Amino acid sequence: QRFFNEYLKETVKTMIYFLTSSPSVSVDGPINPANGFLDRLREALGNNPLHALFVTTYPDDAPWSEHCSDCMRKAFEDVGFKFASYVLLDRRTAPDVKKLMKQCDLLILGGAHLPTQNTFLHELEMPKLIKKFKGVVLGISAGTMNSARMAYALPEEPGEPHDKNFARLRPGLGLTEWRILPHFYMYKELTVDGLRMYDDITIPDSRKYGIPFLYFPDGTYLVGQDGKESVYGEYLVFQDGTFCRVAENGQKTLLD
């Protein structure tokens, strides 16, 4: 019986997801090791060469997608990760998504415009495919936001805040119930159409829809597996009309 239990531990895998504001110290920069991110990612991925799949946000913009994908691959290789394969999932490779997902160890959900990526994810039937995925998911910015069961689309492009047809809640991938807003220190200073990102858009939306938001600075991330989720690093939450800082860098917070 003991042998059988040990065998199960080695063979039964479940998905692990890392939802980041950004895994890098700067745009197109090296991996950020803050809050033990690199160590935990190494532990989750193991030592074997990886089969990675990078999901772009703009499937029809090949140059932009290739640049983002290549920068992410280089950042991983620079800290010692090796790849057996590394595939950019865009319009050209979309027909092979089921086969690619079956061989994938590391699924990277890129950043940028959430609604555009959300549309592509549903075209790929990714919410269905990801339910059977047993590898590691890495969410980056918009990719992290789209990982929620019901994703919140922050109006960040001119015209979106006042567009009555702009859907702020959209079905996501269903990895988590939490809605994470990335790049806290950058976004809190930004405005769009004369509105402050946080004070005039996200906080009123939290009240309107009755949903809490987790605000992550770069370097903070959420790890989830088997229904348990923890945040590593500094983050803030707006819930029930209250905006508060929950944790600082270096701290781990278990989410309820």
How should these model regions be labeled?
Residues 104, 133-134, 176:
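Short, well-ordered alpha-helix to beta-strand connector turns
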Residues 15-47, 59, 66, 70, ...:
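C-terminal and late-domain segments of enzyme folds
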Residues 18, 106-110, 138-139, 179-180:
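Structural motif
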Residues 110, 131-150:
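Catalytic nucleophile loop
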Residues 114-123, 191:
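Glycine/threonine-rich flexible loop motifs
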Residues 54-55, 59-116:
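Portal/gating segments that form or line small-molecule/metal binding sites
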Residues 100, 123-135:
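Catalytic-core regions built around general acid/base machinery
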Residues 1-14:
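Short, Lys/Arg-enriched N-terminal segments with co-localized hydrophobic residues
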